[in-house]
């Protein structure tokens, strides 16, 4: 009897994002084994127990907590551990706090799962993904950040609300940093095959284009608005992470705006940024050299320089 290959996923961090991601993965039936690791072992144990007791309602999955040794031979290791921005802080304000945490996490993950794909979710995600790449010694394809997959979903949702259509029929991308310097790629935005400006003219008698100024700011501020009200974000980001995991494990060749290592694309080098990228079983297979506008390219380069500056001033070395 030939047994189907099992998929083992480990999640480092049992906070709001980590535990909700475990729930989303469990619901989606992507993994046969999920291991949750956290410095607070009681918290990790409780989250795993709570999830495991719903096993009768989902596809067969073994959910448990443990230490790094229990993550051995994981296919994907998702890193959600770290401190999040407090009200009034930006993602970039917490670099060195999370860098210290990552210096303790990444070597342990690499030790036990040297062939895994590392999926970084903790913020600032682009910088921490670059740091993970440097600390792990893994090939660039196997170190992936969640990038702007969530931001892109937020924009699709907002455009769908604006035009009163299904979000799945909106095609657009947020590129660059997952943060304040991110760029809305309006040049790549289309609905029903029509550029968003042309589509707007066909459905709106008074299309002044103001949404192109308003919605990007709403996307940038969405997380801060949620954090100010409930203290954290967890649901949408967990769904975004699950979508990335799905693309990897199912070898989809899906195009997602994950954070990938730039090596000369658009004149940018040696920094992780979000860009439409082919995601398959190898991880982030290829950044697509899509035709963005000159203004978008200039802003992408500025975004890269901002991140490089923060990396240079970090305590990486």
UniProtKB/Swiss-Prot annotation:
Q: Fetch the PROSITE patterns from UniProt.
A: L_LDH (PS00064)
Q: Which UniProt keywords apply?
A: Allosteric enzyme, Cytoplasm, NAD, Oxidoreductase, Phosphoprotein
- The answer to keyword NAD applying to this record is yes
GO cellular component terms, A-Z? cytoplasm
**EC number of this enzyme:** 1.1.1.27
Task: Give GO terms for biological process.
Answer: glycolytic process; lactate metabolic process
Chain sites annotated for binding NAD(+): 17, 38, 43, 68, 82-83, 104, 121-123, 146
Q: Which residues bind substrate?
A: 91, 123-126, 151-154, 233
**What are the GO MF terms of this UniProt record?**
L-lactate dehydrogenase activity
Where in or outside the cell it occurs: the entry states: Cytoplasm
What this protein catalyses is: (S)-lactate + NAD(+) = pyruvate + NADH + H(+)
Q: Write the signal peptide boundaries.
A: none
**Keyword Membrane: yes or no?**
no
Briefly describe activity regulation. Allosterically activated by fructose 1,6-bisphosphate (FBP).
Pathway listed: Fermentation; pyruvate fermentation to lactate; (S)-lactate from pyruvate: step 1/1
Catalytic residues, per the record, are: 178 (proton acceptor)
Complex and partners: Homotetramer.
PANTHER family per UniProt: L-2-HYDROXYCARBOXYLATE DEHYDROGENASE (NAD(P)(+)) (PTHR43128), L-LACTATE DEHYDROGENASE (PTHR43128:SF16)
Q: Which family does it belong to?
A: Belongs to the LDH/MDH superfamily. LDH family.
Q: What is this protein called?
A: L-lactate dehydrogenase
Q: What is the lineage of its organism?
A: Bacteria, Bacillati, Bacillota, Clostridia, Eubacteriales
Q: Which gene encodes it?
A: ldh
